[in-house]
Amino acid sequence: MYEVDMTIIGGGLVGASIAWGLARSGTKPLVLDGADLDLRASRANFALVWVQGKGLHAPHYALWSDASARRWPTMANTLLDDSGIDVGLQQDGAFTFALSEEELEANRQDMESIELETNGRAPQFEVLDRQQTLDRVLGIGPEVVGSIYCAADGHVNALRLFHALHAAMERQGATYRPNHPVQSIEPTTGGFILKGEAFSILSRRIVLAAGLDNKRLAPMVGLSCPLKRSKGQILVTEKTQTALPCLSAGMRQADEGGIMIGDSEETDNTRISSSPDISAVLASRALRIFPALSDLNVVRSWTGFRVKTADGVPIYDHSERYPGAFLVACHSGVTLAANHALIVAQQIAAGQLEDELSVFSARRFHAQQAV
């Protein structure tokens, strides 16, 4: 039987970020990944480094997101050194546009609640009326009544980030095995036996970073990972030399020139196919915000399933019953990548998650049920 010290189950953005961080700290993990056609959030993400509006009624999540966004410049530079790939990080701030006074007021209340709940430690924001928004953003449509602006937000090139993480983790000594889905985990003396269709591996320590499959795998090591279905859809326009004037919650322009339009959510759909109705809604809202987009053709559309926990807040756990088993689950794999690579990986390498992460344990769901 093949024996290793550390295995990460899952090679998406979360698993690769942790694998790279572990490899840099001296722990050279084996990464077992699924197939290309598996339901992967990593290949359908919007690539935002985003803190605006995150952590409503969960101040620890708001501050955790902000901390990761602040670490992203270090992450991007280190990743460039290790992989030779520039992930195109831009952190110039972003807008959330409102198409009604009610929408603007709801967004303002959410941001003020986060500010209050974090005792003013969350990133600063501005509530802008229509004229103030026009002064900063050219070309907005007549229906835009105002916006929220946060200077902490940004984005990266999604495909280059994924490529860079995989290149960097392997150059630092991680071993990557695609098409190796784990069917079962058996705790045993000296670690865990991981079994797949054509392999059996004894690993002293493991990290569950398998996205949607964490829900199935977690109970095998005495953990839980409550997830809810969340399907998102993205439209991509043809490449254009005309720059989108700003980054926003539902629109971003990749550095190659194409404009991505997203921000949908379906909770009762299991099909991977795109919905024409949702495409129409996404396109309509985008055109109401930036009418000039009508000159562009949509050339691609795809969907993905977010790894969204039952309350939307990440889960970081360490099995009490089977020490050596860790779990990480979140739907903010890009934003939190810096924390995962630079902070969480080091704690896993040391064998214990620190107290600051205890509030993210899935035990919170059991406590809620008890109440």
UniProtKB/Swiss-Prot annotation:
Pfam families: DAO (PF01266). It comes from the Bacteria. Its EC number is 1.-.-.-. Pathway: Opine metabolism; octopine degradation. One of its GO terms (molecular function) is oxidoreductase activity. Keywords: Oxidoreductase, Plasmid. It is an enzyme of class 1 (oxidoreductase). The keyword Oxidoreductase applies. GO terms for cellular component: cytoplasm. Coiled coil: none annotated. The keyword Transmembrane helix does not apply. PANTHER family: GLYCINE OXIDASE, SARCOSINE DEHYDROGENASE-RELATED. Oxidative cleavage of octopine into L-arginine and pyruvate. Heterodimer of a subunit A and a subunit B. This is Opine oxidase subunit B. The gene is ooxB.
